[in-house]
Amino acid sequence: MVKELISSAEDHMKKSVDVVRREFASLRAGRATPSILDKVTVSYYGTPTPLNQLANISVPEARVLVIQPWDKSVIPEVEKAILKSDVGITPSSDGTVIRLIIPQLTQERRTELVKVIKKKAEEGRVAVRNIRRDTNDSIKAKQKDGIPEDEAKRGQDELQKLTDKYVKEIDEMVKAKEQEIMQV
C-alpha cells in the first residue's frame, strides 16, 4: 500500500521536473531554438493552433529562426501571434517565410532571465514538496487504518529521499541554464 503511494508520488514528481524542464527550454538564452515558440498559438481560421502545427520552424544560423508556414495566407496571423506572445522578438516577413532574429542578450536581460529561471525552479521545488506533503498525509492516514508504524516510517524516509533527488535535479537544471544564459 505504501509502495503504491510512493510510486505514484514519484510519477508526479517526475512530471513536475519535466514541467520545469519545458519551462526552461522555452526561455531564450541568446541562441535560436525552436522551443522558444512552443507556447505561441495562432488563430488559424478561428481556431487557436500551436505554431509548430502550422509551420516548419528551422534554425539556419545561430541567431536566426525561420518559420515557413505551410499555408502562406496565415503569415499575417503568425506575425500577430508572435508579437502578442512573450517571446519579445519582432518578426520580419518576406511573403513566404518569417524570420526571427534573436538579439544579443544584454547583461541586464541576462540577470532578469536568471531571476525568472530561479522563480520557475522554486515553483517546481514547491510542487515536489507539495507532492511529498500530500503523500505523507496519505501514509499517516493509512497508518491510522492499520499499516505498521515501521512500514509507514520507511515509506516516509523513502519519500524524503525521492524529494531530495528531484529537488537536486531541479537545482542542477538551474545551474546549467544559468551558465548557459550568463555565457557571453
Curated annotation (Swiss-Prot):
Gene Ontology biological process terms in this record: translational termination
GO cellular component: cytoplasm
InterPro entries noted in UniProt: Ribosome_recyc_fac (IPR002661), Ribosome_recyc_fac_dom (IPR023584), RRF_sf (IPR036191)
Chief subcellular location: cytoplasm
SUPFAM superfamilies: Ribosome recycling factor, RRF
GO molecular function: ribosomal large subunit binding
Keyword Cytoplasm applies: yes
Cross-referenced HAMAP family: RRF
Function, as annotated: Responsible for the release of ribosomes from messenger RNA at the termination of protein biosynthesis. May increase the efficiency of translation by recycling ribosomes from one round of translation to another.
Family classification: Belongs to the RRF family.
Name of the protein in question: Ribosome-recycling factor
Source species taxonomy: Bacteria, Bacillati, Bacillota, Clostridia, Eubacteriales
